[in-house]
Amino acid sequence: NILIIGANGFTGRQILNDLSNKEQYNATGCSLHPDILPNGDGKYHFVTTDIRDEAAIKHLFKEAQPDAVINCSALSVPDYCETHHEEAYLTNVTAVEQLAYLCEIYKSRFIHLSTDFVFDGKIDENSGQLYTEESLPAPVNYYGFTKWKGENRIAEICSNYAIVRVEIVYGKALPGQHGNIVQLVMNRLNAGQEIRVVSDQWRTPTYVGDVSDGVQRLIENTANGIFHICGDECMTIAEIAFHVADCMKLDRSLIHPIT
């Protein structure tokens, strides 16, 4: 039995769809809002639940009896988190703590999606060095702080867990989902609109299907700890935008790198 929390989100939906099409899994999707794709091909159960509601999430665990819980839910817009500290902490820390405690009670493996925003980005890009699972977090915004705090609480509470850090996850989004950098660039350029993108921020863009595949491996892998799932190319946001324009044969002159 697999419980996917945040199943209406971009990454969560991919994981739900993939797991629900495998015979060995009995998948339950959970989101704050009703199923975004109720007539999809996957075989799954869908529940509308607010994970910030302690009673509701306890009831969900009782009904789902999960062997593994995959938490893709988060308040993940950095600028919003900066001005809504209480809401961000409640979603990214307090609710995560509750999930961790329930996973211990039900002996569920807890797979929690986190972010590269736990780092400060000051690593020397000229050295060719990348952040590893052993790198020391040093968040510079409140979103990153809450995600790091959530990671720490999971490690303190859970005896069976995997923290999965991802970044710049891309792929095709469904209507109503938050977009990603690839879709954003395509939409703007197709509309003939200019787009400004940073050229001094290095990231490793990751295909959403690869994240799903990595999470599936971690369901069966009993190792505890932090795992980075990312693409194999490091590039700036501006370079990503230019790649999208070239691949889709769109007007790259509309892209303006900034620092």
Sequence positions of predicted segments:
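Mid/C-terminal beta-alpha module of Rossmann-like enzyme folds, strongest
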Residues: G214, N221-T259
